[in-house]
Curated annotation (Swiss-Prot):
This is Photosystem II reaction center protein Z. It is found in: Plastid, Chloroplast thylakoid membrane. Signal peptide: none annotated. It comes from Vitis vinifera (Grape). One of its GO terms (cellular component) is chloroplast thylakoid membrane. PANTHER family: PHOTOSYSTEM II REACTION CENTER PROTEIN Z (PTHR34971:SF2). The keyword Transmembrane applies. It is a multi-pass membrane protein. May control the interaction of photosystem II (PSII) cores with the light-harvesting antenna, regulates electron flow through the 2 photosystem reaction centers. PSII is a light-driven water plastoquinone oxidoreductase, using light energy to abstract electrons from H(2)O, generating a proton gradient subsequently used for ATP formation. PSII is composed of 1 copy each of membrane proteins PsbA, PsbB, PsbC, PsbD, PsbE, PsbF, PsbH, PsbI, PsbJ, PsbK, PsbL, PsbM, PsbT, PsbY, PsbZ, Psb30/Ycf12, at least 3 peripheral proteins of the oxygen-evolving complex and a large number of cofactors. It forms dimeric complexes. Coiled coil: none annotated. The gene is psbZ. Keywords: Chloroplast, Membrane, Photosynthesis, Photosystem II, Plastid, Reaction center, Thylakoid, Transmembrane, Transmembrane helix. The chain crosses the membrane at residues 8-28, 41-61.
Length: 62
């Protein structure tokens, strides 16, 4: 169970880092938002899911 928690935290940190870089690039590029809207929403949905997963796994470990 601990390894699953550690992998979930690593995935959350990696997703946060990717979104931290990619979202401003999408907004700064001309025509970036309209063509990359689905990718940004998918990344955000993944991030929200990982936040809940880390919270659930944390409650099981503690």
């Amino acid at each position: 169970m601990t390894i699953a928690f550690q992998l979930a935290v690593f995935a959350l940190i990696a997703t946060s880092s990717i979104l931290l870089i990619s979202v401003p690039v999408v907004f700064a590029s001309p025509d970036g938002w309209s063509s990359n809207k689905n990718i940004v929403f998918s990344g955000t949905s993944l991030w929200i899911g990982l936040v809940f997963l880390v919270g659930i796994l944390n409650s099981l470990i503690s």
